[in-house]
Amino acid sequence: RLFKQYFAIDAYDVSYSRFDGTESKVFRREVFERDADAVAVLAYDVKTDEIALIEQFRIGALNDSDSPWLIEIVAGMIDGNERPEISAIRELKEEIGVSISEDKLLRICEEYATPGGASEKTTVFIANTDLSGLGNHGGLDVEGEDIRVFKAPLTEAYKQIGLGRIKNAVTILAIQYLLIEKEKVKQIFR
């Protein structure tokens, strides 16, 4: 382990079997490590065709030419031995104040955002939610969160991707998935 504070950096000396059957040379790579994997949840109201989005400060976007305040979907770390579904339900409550049961979750994929240098895997869900009582603020003070919560029509959120306003990869993935598979998702949530 080369470094450990809020995050960690580990170094690995690795080799692998190449596609041509030979063994690669041993090489060193540093990997940005998280103590746990993550979940991301697109809260979707089937009745209104709206989604819940959040806006929060992100240190990784500090030098972004527009703003370090990013528009995202609900996301967070998996605690201990929690199943991803339980983490998703907890994060929905913590970040946007919405409570759901596990049968309202649809797992759409698992993804590695930056596997060339980071180990974090995110399980992505769509949640069948009623957004009629959605508040405008969320997050946990103990986690340093100050989250603006808002609703957007699905098609308007998609337009914000093209305008460069939504820059978070897992958010883009979830919105695009829902647009492509909306009829299937609606059938599942009936």
Regions found by a protein language model. Give the residues of each.
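A short coil-to-beta-strand element that immediately follows conserved catalytic motifs
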Residues: 99-108
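Acidic, metal-coordinating catalytic segment for phosphate/diphosphate chemistry
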Residues: 2-48
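Short loop segments at secondary-structure junctions
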Residues: 17-19, 45-47, 57, 127-132, ...
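Extended, acidic-biased charged interface segments
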Residues: 85-97, 126-127
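Conserved Nudix-box catalytic region and its N-terminal flanking loop in Nudix hydrolases
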Residues: 32-33, 42, 50-90, 112, ...
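Active-site-adjacent beta-strand/loop module that shapes the phosphate/pyrophosphate-binding cleft
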Residues: 14-19, 114-135
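Conserved hydrophobic/aromatic beta-strand scaffold that supports enzyme active sites
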Residues: 9-11, 53, 124-126, 149-151
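Nudix hydrolase/Nudix homology domain
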Residues: 61, 66-69, 80, 107, ...
